[in-house]
């Protein structure tokens, strides 16, 4: 998988990573000296198309906040979890931000993981003391590249869980009064046990630096996939786009270098054979023989136009391929309705990542709950990726339909919610409050006017009932016609 990750690493690292890997992606040309090659490298830039696509995909998946719902019908989520998701890693990161980073890593590399850890200390006698001590589970994001190995028991079945995972880590430790050093270590996770290995002396090799136990009967690691091939193995779904992104950077670098070289035309002299240097300025002349000639030579612009056209075509390919990859859309023309439906298609990358991310976060919550002896809430991600914001004219039209009685209050609020005008509205609660306010205003009216308002309300209710009856009658007639046709 490391070969597949190199293009992703370059896309993620941007211009700096592209230049550092110049021997692979911008190799030295024959007869090109070292200095010229270096100049060509440092003229190269890298456009972040692949990373932008991954960020946009994660933004669509998590454009609405993650919801925690009680697993008991009608129950409420414990305030403990509401506080936990405000700071899931001990550094003030919310669950939404953590999940967004996790989704981006999964989309880029094919999979990513979350380690659910707990402070190493003496266990508290109960949950109340634990909260007073500030002990709580925290999350650590693990990129796919950090997972260097895993193992199953030889006698285990294919569906049995992994019983050992090895993670590559780099930690910063203080050195002296002001300095610090980065130390590599290997974390080995097993059910109910963990160890950290560091390099000892040359004779010792890798030695156990830290070790401990956990209260969980499983390895506290949850994995989410975007391109799963096997357990802890995947293929980056954006790899074809990353390859195009690198080709785009190569062509752009060639064009920039060509323009740099061709920016100054070359002076050519015919019939001039005098040795020595030639001085060119406004106050100097060159004497040529009668058959001599002098002129500036520059490349034809058609070569640059062809190169620019190819670069533009690569940009269009990346855009089209990105849309088709994320939404499972065809490369050809589609109707607006088919594009809208494909956003929520169960086979689209957005849908796959969303489902797997929700399952992974649910496992994370279950393991965190097992640490503290509580019931975990249910994690809910919104699956509506169709971001279509209503314009002012459309809002006015819906308001007019509601005023004319063509749609109900609930329908109006639902359309405003879907159109991102009132994205977080609780429709049932809003309707209830509106009815209460209407009843309160009724009591403030003079008694002589209440009857007129009540009659108007009753008439409105009768009109709605008549409309429903007409709709039912029309449906029955349509059904009879279909039977006659059959």
Q: For each of these PLM feature ranges, what is it?
A:
Residues 1-29, 155-179, 183, 311:
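Surface-exposed assembly/interface segments
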Residues 1-139, 474-486:
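Extended, helix-rich architectural segments
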Residues 33-41, 46, 102, 302, ...:
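Conserved aromatic-histidine-acidic binding/catalytic patches
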Residues 60, 64, 68, 91-98, ...:
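Short secondary-structure junctions and interdomain/linker hinges
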Residues 80, 90, 94-99, 106, ...:
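Short amphipathic alpha-helical segments
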Residues 106-228:
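Extended, regular secondary-structure scaffolds
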Residues 203-340:
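Extended, charged amphipathic alpha-helical segments
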Residues 285-287, 306, 313-486:
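C-terminal helix-loop subdomains that flank or include functional centers
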């Amino acid at each position: 998988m490391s070969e597949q990750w190199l293009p992703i690493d370059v896309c993620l690292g941007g211009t700096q990573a592209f230049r550092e890997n110049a021997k692979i992606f911008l190799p030295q040309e024959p007869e090109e000296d070292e200095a010229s090659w270096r100049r060509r490298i440092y003229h190269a830039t890298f456009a972040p198309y692949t990373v932008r696509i991954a960020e946009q995909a994660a933004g669509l998946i998590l454009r609405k906040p993650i919801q925690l719902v009680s697993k008991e019908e009608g129950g409420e989520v414990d305030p403990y979890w509401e506080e936990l998701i405000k700071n899931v890693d001990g550094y003030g990161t919310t669950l939404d931000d953590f999940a967004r980073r996790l989704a981006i890593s999964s989309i880029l590399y094919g999979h990513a993981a979350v380690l659910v850890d707990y402070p190493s200390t003496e266990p508290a006698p109960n949950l109340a003391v634990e909260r007073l001590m500030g002990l709580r589970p925290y999350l650590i994001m693990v990129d796919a590249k950090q997972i260097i190995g895993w193992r199953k028991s030889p006698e285990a079945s294919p569906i049995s869980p992994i019983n050992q995972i090895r993670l590559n880590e780099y930690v910063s430790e203080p050195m002296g009064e002001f300095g610090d050093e980065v130390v590599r270590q290997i974390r080995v996770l097993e059910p109910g046990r963990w160890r950290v290995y560091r390099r000892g002396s040359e004779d010792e090799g890798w030695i156990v630096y830290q070790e401990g136990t956990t209260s969980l009967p499983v390895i506290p690691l949850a994995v989410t996939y975007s391109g799963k091939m096997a357990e802890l193995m995947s293929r980056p779904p954006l790899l074809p786009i990353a390859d195009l992104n690198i080709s785009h950077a190569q062509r752009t670098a060639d064009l920039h270098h060509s323009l740099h070289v061709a920016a100054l035309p070359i002076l050519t002299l015919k019939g001039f054979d005098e040795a020595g240097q030639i001085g060119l300025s406004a106050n100097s002349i060159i004497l040529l023989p009668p058959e001599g000639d002098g002129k500036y030579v520059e490349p034809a612009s058609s070569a640059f136009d062809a190169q620019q056209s190819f670069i533009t075509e690569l940009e269009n390919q990346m855009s089209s391929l990105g849309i088709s990859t994320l939404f499972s859309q065809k490369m050809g023309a589609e109707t607006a309705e088919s594009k809208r439906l494909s956003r929520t298609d169960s086979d689209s990358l957005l849908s796959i990542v969303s489902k797997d991310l929700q399952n992974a976060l649910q496992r994370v919550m279950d393991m965190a709950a097992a640490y503290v002896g509580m019931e975990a809430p249910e994690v809910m991600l919104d699956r509506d990726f169709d971001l279509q914001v209503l314009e002012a004219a459309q809002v006015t039209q819906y308001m007019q339909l509601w005023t004319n009685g063509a749609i109900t209050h609930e329908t109006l609020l639902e359309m405003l919610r879907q159109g991102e005008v009132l994205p977080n509205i609780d429709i049932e609660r809003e309707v209830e409050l509106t009815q209460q306010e209407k009843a309160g205003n009724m009591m403030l009216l003079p008694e002589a006017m209440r009857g007129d308002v009540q009659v108007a309300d009753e008439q409105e209710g009768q009109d709605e009932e008549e409309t429903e009856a007409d709709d039912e009658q029309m449906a029955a007639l349509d059904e009879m016609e279909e039977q006659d046709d059959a």
